[in-house]
């Protein structure tokens, strides 16, 4: 692979992809086939915003929070560092203190805890709320994880979500990192221009720098 090639770190979206229990299942179908239209196939997509690789907006957990269209899209494009934090049940300031994060603006955490896009996990590693001020002090503006949430799956307080955005840190979830090495990359993970949404699916890609 050439170093200039982009590497996809997104979960493929298809009718078998796992969704949050109780949330809208993913569905794609050709609703207007070429045989009927005379010229084209037209598809219909039904999905939850939080299926597959996606970003969260504050409106997801705060009725007064910013929606996707209000977010700074510059945060989702630029240099990123991938680090390995596998075999940890939770990740906070203590777990990251020994990593060199100087000059890092975007950080992706490889937990290698699940990896089965067609099965929703029962338990995931989660982030401690104290990670937010720690990352903010380092100048980090985006945190990404390879699991569906930065908080425990059964948590209702979503303290990590709240503290991350309180400290100016954007959230990217469900990236796929098992096929890429630790190190520095360029990231593109742009959300759609959804005016009223609490999140957005993204096509997240990286390339070495």
Curated annotation (Swiss-Prot):
The keyword ATP-binding does not apply. Keywords: Hydrolase, Metal-binding, Tryptophan catabolism, Zinc. SUPFAM superfamilies: Putative cyclase. Zn(2+) 1 binds at residues 50, 54, 56, 173. Pathway: Amino-acid degradation; L-tryptophan degradation via kynurenine pathway; L-kynurenine from L-tryptophan: step 2/2. The active site is at 60 (proton donor/acceptor). Its cofactor is Zn(2+). It catalyses: N-formyl-L-kynurenine + H2O = L-kynurenine + formate + H(+). InterPro entries: KFase/CYL, KFase_sf, Kynurenine_formamidase_bac. Binds 2 zinc ions per subunit. It holds the Pfam family Cyclase. Its EC number is 3.5.1.9. Zn(2+) 2 binds at residues 56, 161, 173. Substrate binds at residue 20. It comes from the Bacteria. Homodimer. Catalyzes the hydrolysis of N-formyl-L-kynurenine to L-kynurenine, the second step in the kynurenine pathway of tryptophan degradation. Belongs to the Cyclase 1 superfamily. KynB family. This is Kynurenine formamidase. The lineage of its organism: Bacteria, Bacillati, Bacillota, Bacilli, Bacillales.
């Amino acid at each position: 692979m050439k170093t200039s090639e982009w590497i996809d770190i997104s979960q493929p979206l298809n009718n078998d992809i796992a969704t949050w229990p109780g949330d809208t299942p993913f569905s794609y179908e050709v609703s207007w086939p070429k045989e009927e239209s005379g010229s084209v196939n037209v598809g219909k997509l039904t999905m939850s915003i939080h299926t597959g690789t996606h970003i969260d907006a504050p409106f997801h957990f705060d009725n007064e929070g910013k929606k996707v269209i209000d977010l700074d899209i510059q945060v989702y494009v630029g240099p990123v560092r991938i680090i390995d934090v596998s075999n940890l049940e939770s990740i906070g300031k203590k777990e990251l203190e020994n990593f060199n994060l100087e000059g890092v603006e975007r950080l992706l955490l490889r937990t290698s805890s699940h990896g089965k896009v067609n099965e929703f996990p029962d338990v995931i590693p989660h982030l401690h709320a104290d990670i937010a001020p720690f990352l903010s002090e380092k100048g980090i503006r985006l945190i990404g994880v390879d699991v569906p949430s930065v908080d425990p799956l059964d948590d209702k307080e979503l303290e990590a979500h709240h503290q991350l955005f309180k400290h100016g840190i954007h959230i990217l979830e469900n990236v796929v990192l098992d096929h890429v090495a630790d190190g520095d990359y360029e990231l593109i993970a742009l959300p759609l221009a959804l005016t009223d949404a609490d999140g957005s699916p993204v096509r997240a890609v990286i390339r070495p720098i």
